[in-house]
Amino acid sequence: MNISNLKSRFPVFKKNPNLVFLDTAASALKVDEMIEATNNCYTNEYANIHRGNYELSSKLTKKFEDARKKVADYLNTSENNIIFVKSATEGINLIASCMSKRFLEDDDEIILSYLEHHANLIPWHLIEKKIKIIPLGLNENSEINYDELNDKINSKTNLIKIGRAHV
């Protein structure tokens, strides 16, 4: 993959060619095609999805569900497993809330690494009265200590949450 060709699809790099953008979980940069598609939607097609009983709403609902199917196919999963959220933070909050209500029992344990982003720590601490948070340390290279992880997994472990990016 040629990084220059990829960067050329993002308008922001025209004025900021040396920009290194690492805040994608909160606010992703947009490629030209996405900006054009969004503009077209707001200009020509905008309607409430799954809410209206009129042509614009039906067409946009179909596009929305077609997108869900494409994501599901790409991930080789069912469309029922795909939930669209506005940010990684919202997704983490949703998962923590749902798990605390349906899947977590008193005294269950969740293993969280010291590398977690703040947005991935707060939701679990909010439900800590029900569960126990087990911190996962780092090795001498400041990487996740997988040997320690194996030692911490036990019959009470319900979830292991290790972020793969910290931006």
Question: What does each model-found stretch correspond to?
Answer:
Residues V167:
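Calmodulin-binding IQ motif helices
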Residues M1-R164:
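Pyridoxal 5′-phosphate
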